[in-house]
């Protein structure tokens, strides 16, 4: 049984949140007890600081809110909750939503079109998500909408817009850019060979550096076994930035499970 690190009379009601049940999802399965307590503490603070706004009739239960907060805080487990400053609301649709998109082509013509989005992360505004894809983010599959949008927020802290290079020491920027672009080219080569649907890494990663960072952040936390061996140099840079090693967590958890089986038998 966890001893949760907040007061029972907390006005936010966080002391009554179903944290243990919320932690019971595959993407969080390999966290140590210490990491679970730390993540839950961050998630409680997240819910105190941010407003989750359910749209179009969606109802968010305490369990839903707890799991959303845990996923938001997973990337900043070691960075700190202050890395999520800069927005105050999370807007949540029931399903992917339609937005009016405006973009400028290479010759300066402005185009408008309606597009379906899974999520959005405004630099000086809210994070927008949808509940269907949030639920899919509970798995350890390489897809995680919440981590993706959080990665954009972290990326944008380094300048006016997300660039694929988060806030790292200046001396590391050139190496980061080199390894990130090498990964993009590698992913594009695979797409050219087998097609987008058959590619082992989400093809969206090849579109631009910011999306590559966000997509690979999804794999970093939810499918490290696909990321680490394919891009070992970039993997080490992600470990250094996030101050976490999800692949090592899996290995340590596996060894612990093996030890437990030996004790049982």
UniProtKB/Swiss-Prot annotation:
Its main location: cytoplasm. Keywords: Aminopeptidase, Cytoplasm, Hydrolase, Metal-binding, Metalloprotease, Protease, Zinc. InterPro entries: MetalloPept_cat_dom_sf (IPR024079), MtfA_enterob (IPR057256), MtfA_fam (IPR010384), MtfA_N (IPR042252). GO terms for cellular component: cytosol. Zn(2+) binds at residues 111, 148, 152, 211. The keyword Thylakoid does not apply. Pfam families: Peptidase_M90 (PF06167). GO terms for molecular function: aminopeptidase activity; metallopeptidase activity; zinc ion binding. It is an enzyme of class 3 (hydrolase). Belongs to the MtfA family. Interacts with Mlc. Involved in the modulation of the activity of the glucose-phosphotransferase system (glucose-PTS). Interacts with the transcriptional repressor Mlc, preventing its interaction with DNA and leading to the modulation of expression of genes regulated by Mlc, including ptsG, which encodes the PTS system glucose-specific EIICB component. Shows zinc-dependent metallopeptidase activity. This is Mlc titration factor A. It comes from Klebsiella pneumoniae (strain 342).
């Amino acid at each position: 049984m966890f001893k949760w690190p907040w007061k029972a009379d907390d006005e936010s009601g966080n002391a009554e949140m179903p944290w243990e049940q919320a932690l019971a999802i595959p993407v969080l399965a390999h966290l140590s007890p210490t990491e679970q307590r730390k993540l839950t503490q961050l998630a409680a603070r997240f819910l105190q600081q941010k407003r989750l706004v359910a749209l179009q009739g969606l109802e968010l239960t305490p369990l839903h809110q707890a799991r959303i907060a845990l996923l938001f805080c997973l990337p900043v487990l070691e960075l700190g909750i202050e890395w999520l400053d800069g927005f105050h609301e999370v807007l949540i649709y029931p399903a992917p939503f339609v937005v009016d998109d405006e973009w400028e082509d290479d010759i300066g013509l402005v185009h408008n079109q309606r597009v379906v989005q899974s999520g959005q992360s405004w630099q000086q505004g809210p994070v927008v998500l949808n509940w269907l894809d949030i639920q899919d983010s509970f798995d350890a599959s390489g897809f995680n909408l919440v981590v993706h949008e959080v990665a954009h927020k972290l990326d944008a802290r380094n300048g006016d817009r997300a660039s694929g290079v988060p806030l790292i020491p200046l001396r590391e920027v050139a190496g980061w850019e080199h390894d990130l672009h090498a990964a993009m080219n590698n992913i594009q080569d695979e797409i050219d060979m087998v097609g987008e649907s058959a590619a082992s890494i989400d093809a969206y990663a090849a579109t631009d550096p910011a999306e590559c960072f966000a997509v690979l952040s999804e794999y970093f936390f939810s499918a490290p076994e696909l990321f680490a061996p394919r891009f070992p140099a970039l993997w080490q840079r992600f470990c250094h930035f996030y101050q976490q090693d999800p692949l090592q967590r899996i290995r340590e958890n596996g060894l612990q499970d093996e030890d437990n089986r030996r004790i049982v038998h």
